Amino acid sequence: MPKKNEQPASFETALTELEQIVTRLESGDLPLEEALNEFERGVQLARQGQVKLQQAEQRVQILLSQNEDAPLTPFTPDAE
């Protein structure tokens, strides 16, 4: 497992590690201190993932704004 301050290589790597942490926490077999450390790492990974998603969204909006003919509409998950 990467050290606390180490940045994950990619969004996908962070997501995979976060999923593993959730699985370990849900098992209920971890001692309290280890569970707290895992939870702390999970929060850190979730925040990093959120930042990466926001950056990706900004890049997409910039690319779309360069093509003025393409309408820019906010994403809504219910629209699918």
UniProtKB/Swiss-Prot annotation:
**Top-level taxon of the source organism:** Bacteria
Q: Which GO terms describe its cellular component?
A: cytosol; exodeoxyribonuclease VII complex
Entry keyword annotation includes Nuclease: yes
The EC number of this protein is 3.1.11.6
Q: Write out the GO biological process terms.
A: DNA catabolic process
The first-level EC class reads: hydrolase
Reaction(s) catalysed (UniProt annotation): Exonucleolytic cleavage in either 5'- to 3'- or 3'- to 5'-direction to yield nucleoside 5'-phosphates
Keywords for this protein? Cytoplasm, Exonuclease, Hydrolase, Nuclease
Q: What's a single GO MF annotation on this record? A: exodeoxyribonuclease VII activity
Q: Where in the cell is it found?
A: Cytoplasm
Instruction: Tell me which SUPFAM superfamilies the record gives.
Output: XseB-like (SSF116842)
Q: Does the keyword Cytoplasm apply?
A: yes
UniProt record similarity statement = Belongs to the XseB family.
Q: What does this protein do?
A: Bidirectionally degrades single-stranded DNA into large acid-insoluble oligonucleotides, which are then degraded further into small acid-soluble oligonucleotides.
Subunit details: Heterooligomer composed of large and small subunits.
Q: What is this protein called?
A: Exodeoxyribonuclease 7 small subunit
